[in-house]
């Protein structure tokens, strides 16, 4: 109770003494680099509406940034611009902080395409607040229930096996399991970009998922990741179908249905494909199952 009251008073003081162009996105997040794929990503959860529209920034083949606490959004695009010019995250962050009168209220992390990392937690970020840098990642949090949140995130990211989405999701789950944001939970986001830019923006984004307002944002984010994987396989199936590789297409359509079994449209297109090549014996049972739902 005392800690909650202290937090409320602290927030009131900070909001009355900060510029109107900042937003109090107090939260926990991770920026990370996958050295096996080159992918770069940011994942975040907050008790603030649409955290994904403010905190995470990433550019294929360049880097990723998380800007939070009393958010100054410019750290995102300016950080990416600096990394695109070849500057190290530490240099960029130092320069940006030097020009920011509100630096003590900021929490920022940056990682580049080589895994170089830099992070900052301002002295006036509300407790519990801190960050931890490890190989190819940084985790950071403020207004947390416990000071164990970001160490738990680091351990989860390091120990989890899987792709970048799996590992960053594990970090978010670990934060919530330690108590998470003292104020509760509201929104979450995951942004992942490719390691090698194609010059085609929509191809360079591997994953861009947002839960803007939800009572259990991490649970919903995991559901969206699962659906995203389903449609990745469905898209691969369509690609194989265009190439006339029917067997490969059917394998991908099957995988899509496994990830998203509650959606009848995915097996429907499997049946359409089979019917299109004249294999009605296999197509009809799938059609029946789809239309019985």
Where do the protein language model's features map onto the residues?
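Bacterial Sec-dependent signal peptides at the C-terminal "C-region" and cleavage site
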Residues: 3, 7-23
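Conserved alpha-helical positions within TPR/SEL1-like repeat arrays
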Residues: 268-269
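Alpha/propeptide regions of enzymes that mature by internal proteolysis
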Residues: 17-183, 190, 212-245, 254, ...
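Structural marker of alpha-solenoid helical repeat scaffolds
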Residues: 259, 292-293
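Register position in tetratricopeptide repeats
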Residues: 242, 276-277
């Amino acid at each position: 109770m005392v800690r909650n009251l202290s937090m409320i008073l602290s927030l009131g003081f900070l909001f009355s003494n900060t510029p109107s162009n900042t937003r109090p996105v107090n939260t926990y997040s991770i920026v990370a680099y996958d050295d096996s794929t080159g992918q770069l990503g940011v994942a975040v959860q907050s008790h603030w509406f649409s955290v994904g529209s403010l905190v995470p920034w990433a550019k294929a083949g360049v880097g990723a940034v998380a800007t939070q606490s009393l958010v100054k959004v410019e750290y995102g695009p300016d950080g990416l611009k600096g990394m695109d010019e070849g500057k190290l995250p530490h240099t960029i962050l130092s320069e940006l902080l030097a020009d920011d009168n509100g630096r003590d209220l900021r929490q920022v992390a940056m990682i580049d395409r080589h895994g170089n990392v830099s992070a900052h937690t301002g002295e006036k970020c509300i407790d519990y607040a801190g960050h931890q840098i490890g190989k190819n990642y940084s985790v950071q949090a403020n207004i947390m229930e416990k000071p164990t949140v970001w160490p738990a995130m680091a351990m989860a990211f390091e120990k989890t096996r899987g792709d970048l989405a799996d590992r960053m999701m594990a970090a978010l789950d670990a934060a919530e399991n330690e108590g998470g944001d003292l104020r509760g939970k509201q929104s979450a986001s995951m942004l992942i970009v490719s390691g090698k830019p194609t010059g085609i923006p929509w191809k360079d984004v591997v994953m861009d998922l947002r839960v803007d307002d939800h009572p259990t944002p991490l649970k919903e984010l995991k559901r969206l990741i699962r659906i995203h994987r389903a449609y990745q396989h469905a898209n691969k199936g369509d690609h194989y179908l265009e190439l006339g590789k029917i067997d490969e297409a059917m394998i991908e359509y099957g995988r899509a249905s496994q990830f998203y079994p509650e959606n009848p449209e995915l097996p429907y297109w499997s049946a359409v494909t089979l019917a299109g090549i004249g294999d009605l014996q296999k197509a009809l049972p799938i059609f029946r199952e789809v239309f019985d739902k």
